[in-house]
Regions:
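Polar/acidic, low-complexity leader/linker segments enriched in S/T/G and N/D
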Residues: 1-58
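Short, acidic/charged, Gly/Pro-enriched secondary-structure junctions
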Residues: 8-12, 83-125
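Short amphipathic beta-strand/extended segments with alternating polar/hydrophobic composition
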Residues: 23-39, 119-126, 195-202, 226, ...
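Short beta-strand and beta-hairpin "edge-sheet" elements
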Residues: 45, 109-150
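Compositionally biased P/S/T/G-rich terminal and signal peptide-adjacent segments
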Residues: 50-62, 69-74
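Oligomerization/assembly interface segments of phage tail-like spikes and tubes
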Residues: 64-89, 136-150, 238
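Solvent-exposed loop and beta-edge segments used for protein-protein assembly and interaction
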Residues: 74-78, 102-104, 134-138, 171-173, ...
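Intrinsically disordered, low-complexity segments enriched in serine, threonine, and glycine
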Residues: 152-258
């Protein structure tokens, strides 16, 4: 006589534990805090280059105008959508999620467990709630408008340099690092072929190569800096050295890709 295995009923909480592996974090909070999980990775198109084309009668091909610094390319923002769900979905939960996602002002850090080595800077455009399913699993679609860069988590770590050093950018896009220059008097910082003269240093000077600003403990100190431009770290290797009263340099390289 055959033996039939008893049919087992899987509770919603068991299902939740089984699928509660993928989530996102935004503005310092995790979707796990709301028992909200992702059904799949974010869906998006590659960022479009900011290029204008002009047709000229009688001439083959368009004239292209890059809306960027000479020799560089600018990329436009990209929309990313996630399908998400939580069990025993209640209006209160949906309201809490919307408050979390839609209340922050300005760009916020967005990261998900499908791509844990990278993050984006994003603003939530919408969090649409769907009807609760027969299994009591409420679904949402989360839409974010993101800057084009996928920032490397590893590229946000501080690297301390105590002497002549070489940094290697693993990506095809030039990075705009943050330097923290320590010293007891003025000196010159060399980043590749770029030279930055710092006329005076009191403990340290912070150089933000994205915003083109210099800071110390008292605030802005751009007047103490002399340079043709703030340096970037192109793809491949860049040598960093210094002279004068500079004693050490810390750098956050801020690597990124698309």
């Amino acid at each position: 006589m055959g033996y039939n295995t008893p049919k087992q009923t899987v509770s919603q909480f068991q299902l939740k534990d089984r699928y509660a592996r993928q989530y996102l974090s935004f503005a310092g909070k995790s979707s796990k805090d709301f028992l909200l999980y992702l059904s799949g990775p974010g869906v998006y198109d590659s960022p479009a280059a900011d290029v204008e084309s002009t047709s000229v009668p009688g001439r083959n091909g368009d004239i292209l105008t890059e809306n960027a610094k000479v020799g560089r390319r600018r990329y436009q923002n990209v929309d990313i959508k996630y399908k998400a769900f939580f069990f025993n979905g209640l209006p209160a939960k949906t309201a809490a999620v919307k408050a979390w996602l839609l209340s922050p002002v300005g760009y916020q850090k967005l990261q998900d467990t499908y791509d844990p080595d990278f993050f984006r800077m994003a603003v939530c455009k919408d969090a649409l709630a769907f009807d609760v399913t027969a299994q009591k699993a409420a679904e949402m679609e989360l839409a974010f408008n993101c800057k084009p860069q996928r920032w490397s988590v590893d590229g946000q770590r501080t690297i301390r340099l105590d002497g002549r050093s070489t940094l290697k950018n693993p990506f095809a896009f030039p990075a705009q690092p943050i330097f923290k220059v320590y010293g007891d008097s003025g000196g010159e910082l060399y980043v590749g072929e770029e030279k930055i003269t710092i006329h005076s240093i009191k403990d340290y000077v912070l150089l933000n190569c994205e915003t083109h600003n210099a800071y110390n403990a008292s605030g802005f100190c751009n007047e103490t800096i002399l340079s043709d431009d703030f340096p970037e770290l192109p793809e491949g290797k860049t040598q960093i050295t210094w002279t004068g009263g500079i004693t050490a340099v810390e750098v956050i390289p801020r690597w990124w890709t698309l």
